């Protein structure tokens, strides 16, 4: 093939790589890989599979074209293209009709093929969502069988479940993927916590529908879908539109809404169950900032829920709002957390709380919630706070120590908090004026003999 390509096109195909056999990972036959016109192409034998009852890793042997087609997850993926006759070959006799009619169907009896490899359940959902296909009735019924859901838990490593979910989130219709997962009763199977963790949790799990509601509201905002609600401030949407990875994290976080009020014990105290969902339940971890940014979306909601301006009354409204926006749960570029999307997610959570048991949103209160956030963002812009969110302290720890004549330690951190609050109150003042103010604060009678100032509130509790 390599030589023929070079003879026909005059181009180079590059080196031919061999992917070795690895029976422990279901690689019983070698694969050759070659670059063809800038695309990596795998050359493989036709294969047949034999499954053991307790494993999804099959024994693979060289097979016939029909055997190879039947082992595919859905019929449209079982289509062949014959390079000699330049024609399509539909050995299952269902692939082309299903492609025309928009149906996702398994080539074999769905109950058996899902028992053999339960991951095919998620692949079927992913492809149906990607192409906007309907899942065949018998295929959907098999997905709902308890034996299949048990097999999905027993046979499939959580990393593989997480990989399939990430592909859904990166696809064109992540919301459709989530609603399909919920429709066929595998929401807890995909997102939930194992029994050994569930038995130790505190708090109450919300209905699965809250995850779908949250994702639906979020996607309607991100995609500018007309609803009865006012449009969110454009500043809340800008970052998510520019960063596709951030959009994925927001939708994933919305899907975890049912577990938002739950914690589980660890050696260092109680941790949010949503952190377990991401890190252990789906083994997604730190890739693309899913950890820690997804759990921090929920932490930010606790800090920023319904941020009406009357909650920021004080000597300096600019400082109070600025301290909230600088909070590490609300904004931290190193972890992929941005203040605008933290507020957007918080607004979505507040709106979900307004949906009653009949799945009806209180439109009057919902419009009020959106207006509160829009007014808040307008005030952030009026106060020119965006540039102050990531501004470093005017004085670092070493400079504070030199100005006040104190040694490194906890006291430095206390004064650092004061410096940050001061610069939020006085955005245009000089470093020298900050030093003068800091000396006066340190020497003021209110500090007593120790010279240690009482730290300002690090966060605006709203």
What are these language model-derived features?
Residues 1-462:
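Catalytic cores of the polymerase beta-like nucleotidyltransferase superfamily
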């Amino acid at each position: 093939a390599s030589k023929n390509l070079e003879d026909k096109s005059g181009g180079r195909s590059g080196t031919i790589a061999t992917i070795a056999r690895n029976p422990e990972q279901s690689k019983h036959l070698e694969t050759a890989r070659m670059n063809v016109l800038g695309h990596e192409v795998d050359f493989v034998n036709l294969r047949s599979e034999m499954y053991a009852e307790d494993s999804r890793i099959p024994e693979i042997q060289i097979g016939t074209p029909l055997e190879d087609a039947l082992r595919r997850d859905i019929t449209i993926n079982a289509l062949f293209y014959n390079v000699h006759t330049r024609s399509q070959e539909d050995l299952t006799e269902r692939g082309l009709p299903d492609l025309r009619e928009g149906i996702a169907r398994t080539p074999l009896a769905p109950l058996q093929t899902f028992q053999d490899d339960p991951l095919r359940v998620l692949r079927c959902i992913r492809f149906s969502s990607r192409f906007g296909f309907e899942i065949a009735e018998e295929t959907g019924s098999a997905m709902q069988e308890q034996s299949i859901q048990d097999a999905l838990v027993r046979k499939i490593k959580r990393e593989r479940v997480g990989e399939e979910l990430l592909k859904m989130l990166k696809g064109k219709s992540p919301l459709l993927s989530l609603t399909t997962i919920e429709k066929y009763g595998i929401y807890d199977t995909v997102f939930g916590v194992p029994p050994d963790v569930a038995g130790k949790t505190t708090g109450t799990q919300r209905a699965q529908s809250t995850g779908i509601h949250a994702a639906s509201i979020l996607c309607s905002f991100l995609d500018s879908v007309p609803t009865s609600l006012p449009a969110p401030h454009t500043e809340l949407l800008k970052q998510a539109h520019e960063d596709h990875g951030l959009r994925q994290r927001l939708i994933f976080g919305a899907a975890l809404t049912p577990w938002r009020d739950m914690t589980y014990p660890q050696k260092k105290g109680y941790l949010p169950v949503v952190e377990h969902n991401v890190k252990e339940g789906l083994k997604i971890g730190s890739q693309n900032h899913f950890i820690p940014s997804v759990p921090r979306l929920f932490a930010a909601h606790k800090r920023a829920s319904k941020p009406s301006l009357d909650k920021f009354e004080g000597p300096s409204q600019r400082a109070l709002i600025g301290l909230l926006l600088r909070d590490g749960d609300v904004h931290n570029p190193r972890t992929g957390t941005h203040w605008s999307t933290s507020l957007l997610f918080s607004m979505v959570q507040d709106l979900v709380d307004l949906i009653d048991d009949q799945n009806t949103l209180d439109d009057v209160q919902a419009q009020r919630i959106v207006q509160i956030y829009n007014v808040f963002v307008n005030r952030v812009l009026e106060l020119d706070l965006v540039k102050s969110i990531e501004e470093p302290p005017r004085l670092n720890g070493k400079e504070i120590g030199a100005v006040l004549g104190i040694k490194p330690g906890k006291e430095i951190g206390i004064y650092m908090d004061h410096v940050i609050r001061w610069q939020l109150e006085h955005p245009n003042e000089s470093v020298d004026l900050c030093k003068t103010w800091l000396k006066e604060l340190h020497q003021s009678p209110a500090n007593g003999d120790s010279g240690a100032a009482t730290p300002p509130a690090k966060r605006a509790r709203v």
